[in-house]
Amino acid sequence: MKFAVILLFSLVVLAVASESVEEVRREIDIEDLPEQQRGCADLRQPCTEGDDCSCCGREGVCNCSHPHKKGCYCKTAGPLEKLAKKFKGCKNK
């Protein structure tokens, strides 16, 4: 009986803790921040036209010629695009 009460109490504490973490995530949604505050954009996120460094990682480059989307979005770079980004000396990783 004592074990069941402890287990039930632990589950309640876990549920309350996970709810508060979700609330914080909703409040600080990285997609709602302007790109300058984010530092860099993940793949398939909006980026700055002509600035491959606005996309995170070595794999990301800014693509403004997507056939189904208006605007510029980060995409996975090809081999030559990766090399060009490496020589640009982007600060973000």
UniProtKB/Swiss-Prot annotation:
The keyword Secreted applies. One of its GO terms (molecular function) is toxin activity. Disulfide bonds: none annotated. Residues 1-18 form the signal peptide. Contains 5 disulfide bonds. Residues 19-38 form a propeptide. The keyword Cell wall biogenesis/degradation does not apply. This is U12-lycotoxin-Ls1c. It comes from Lycosa singoriensis (Wolf spider).
